[in-house]
Swiss-Prot record:
Pyruvate binds at residues 46, 204. Belongs to the DapA family. Homotetramer; dimer of dimers. This is 4-hydroxy-tetrahydrodipicolinate synthase. The keyword Ion transport does not apply. Its EC number is 4.3.3.7. GO terms for molecular function: 4-hydroxy-tetrahydrodipicolinate synthase activity. The record marks 45, 108 as: Part of a proton relay during catalysis. One of its GO terms (biological process) is diaminopimelate biosynthetic process. It catalyses: L-aspartate 4-semialdehyde + pyruvate = (2S,4S)-4-hydroxy-2,3,4,5-tetrahydrodipicolinate + H2O + H(+). Pfam families: DHDPS (PF00701). It is found in: Cytoplasm.
Length: 293
């Protein structure tokens, strides 16, 4: 199986007060090693990367790279809405031992497709690591269109895309119009089956923070020829709960209920509201992830 296919977890960043909680981060890494997560994605949206300082980001990369010690691949989110800054941080991640980079489309400033093409080509030219494109227009305000992805797929070190547009027709077109080695990952937990069925290669998952083994086995079984759509659908209520408020608010609360002291999100995000927390607990109990006490 190629690197960066299967089940990748969009890992949270645990906090204790104003600091990153490295003992808990180590526990989370062990949890994923033990439960067959195929690769890690750190410093992405779920990791609250916009609220981490530059020095904190470097510390997280160094800690994860050193602790994992090549046991599973590590992808680092290095994207921003400034090409120069993206290049600089991508070089830092490369120097610190990242195996690949996840680079989101520039957000807020809404570049044209030509701007997106130039941005990614400039970054790819500046580093030697594999790059995974990341399309999430609901957050960035810009869609990475099929023709742009097709053109970028011809760049040697652009290896694939995390596709979170929610548009399965777009996903299908990307798969159909790019070469066979181009990796297409679902960026939405509730669309993993659909993306795999279209010829995709896995997921970068939020829900895998709490059910890593189930997420991994679903994809392993599908790739082994077991086409069981109902097995995927079974987890939809859990996926829905992970987005009842802005990610990663619910998943961090879920991890707290599972015994991982990941702490509250950093402002401007806040802890999960009381009503939603009651709903979350019920769903976690329904899935037998926490006790019924």
């Amino acid at each position: 199986m190629k690197k960066f296919t299967g089940s990748g977890v969009a890992l949270v960043t645990p906090f204790k007060g104003s600091k990153i909680n490295y003992p808990v981060l180590q526990k989370l890494l062990d949890f994923h090693i033990e439960n067959e997560t195929d690769f890690l994605v750190i410093l992405g949206t779920t990791a609250e990367s916009p609220t981490l300082t530059s020095s904190e980001k470097k510390e997280v990369i160094s800690f994860v790279v050193n602790y994992i010690n090549k046991r599973i691949p590590i992808m680092v989110g290095t994207g921003s809405n400034d090409t120069k800054q993206t290049i600089s941080f991508s070089r830092t991640a490369q120097r610190l031992g990242a195996d690949a980079l996840l680079i989101v489309t520039p957000y807020y400033n809404k570049p044209t497709q030509n701007g997106l093409l130039a941005h990614y080509k400039a970054v790819a030219k500046s580093i030697n690591l594999p790059i995974m494109l990341y399309n999430v227009p609901s957050r960035t305000g810009v869609n990475l269109e099929v023709d742009t992805v097709k053109r970028l797929s011809k760049v040697k070190n652009i290896i694939g895309i995390k596709e979170a547009s929610g548009n399965l027709e777009q996903v299908k077109s990307i798969i159909d119009q790019t070469h066979e080695d181009f990796i297409v990952l679902s960026g939405n937990d509730d669309q993993v089956y659909d993306v795999l069925s279209l010829g995709g290669h896995g997921v970068i998952s939020v829900t895998a923070n709490i059910i890593p083994l189930s997420t991994s086995l679903l994809i392993q079984n599908f790739r082994a020829g077991i086409d069981n759509k109902e097995a995927f659908i079974k987890f939809n209520k859990l996926h829905d709960m992970m987005f009842v408020e802005s990610n990663p608010i619910p998943v961090k609360r879920a991890l707290e209920h599972l015994g991982f002291e990941v702490g509250k999100p950093r402002l401007p995000l806040t802890k999960l509201g009381a009503k939603h927390n009651r709903m979350l607990l019920k769903v976690l109990r329904d899935y037998k992830l926490v006790d019924n006490d």
